[in-house]
Design a protein with these regions (language model features):
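N-terminal nicking endonuclease/strand-transfer module with a His-rich metal-binding environment
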Residues: 1-238
Length: 239
């Protein structure tokens, strides 16, 4: 039995400017990886794009599902997750590896040979390996919501097999700051002094007896990365 590590890597801060490169890497297999074109045909697609590119996919998904979000350059539109392990794990599941002719330059394996999957036909991908990735995908669908997953693939054409997926972090409840209102229901404004010495007119926050800001819970469908992971108990729970 293999006792090494299985890796789950999550990235939570993909913004509009990041989506083009992600889409190119996933659909055209161009990017920072070591791609073997002879093995690309063995990649598996769980969830495919329905639009021309990843950004349009995100926009279409949010629009058709009536999901509220802040349309700003710094909005975290997408989360990414990768399930993988070292060659030893996949070898323990019956997959053959071969010498790449390269060595690791950093990390625990510095100086050691980089072993890559030896795949020449679908039969070289064992049922145990397929089951591992199928199980990862089922876990992901249950954990983040199948309807939130926009793109998901198994990549056998890089140095190490991995499942790579992208999803929108959608929640059904958010907490919003409350503001002081006058007798007519209008938000009260106040003048504040900034650090640079200038002043600004802003809505006056509602505070409790202890001076803490009062929040209200709002129901609906919202794209909110911070709240998504707070609801999950934090990123550490997925590792």
């Amino acid at each position: 039995m293999y006792d090494g590590k299985q890796v789950v890597r999550v990235v939570t801060q993909y913004k509009k400017a990041d989506l083009y490169n992600i889409g190119v890497e996933m659909t055209d297999r161009k990017g920072t990886g070591n791609y073997d074109k002879d093995r690309t045909i063995f990649n598996i697609e769980y969830v495919s794009l329905t639009q021309n590119n990843l950004y349009q996919e995100v926009k279409n998904n949010l629009k058709t599902r009536n999901i509220e979000y802040l349309n700003r350059p710094n909005t975290n539109l997408l989360n990414g997750v990768t399930f993988t392990s070292g060659p030893e794990f996949f070898q323990s599941l019956g997959m053959k590896f071969k010498n790449s002719g390269r060595t690791y330059h950093t990390g625990d394996k510095k100086g050691q040979t980089v072993m890559i999957p030896d795949i020449k036909s679908k039969g070289d991908i064992t049922k145990a390996v397929s089951y591992f990735f199928d199980s990862c995908m089922e876990f992901l669908k249950e954990y983040v919501g199948e309807e939130n997953i926009l793109l998901s693939q198994i990549h056998y054409d890089e140095d190490t097999p991995h499942l790579q997926a992208y999803f929108v972090p959608v929640v059904t409840k958010v907490k919003r700051k409350c503001f002081v209102k006058d007798e007519n229901g209008n938000v009260v404004k106040e003048e504040i002094k900034k650090k640079d010495g200038t002043t600004s007119i802003v809505p006056k926050l509602l505070r409790d007896d202890k001076g803490k800001i009062v929040y209200e819970e709002v129901n609906g469908k919202f794209l909110n990365c911070d709240q998504f992971w707070k609801d999950k108990g934090g990123l550490s729970l997925i590792h």
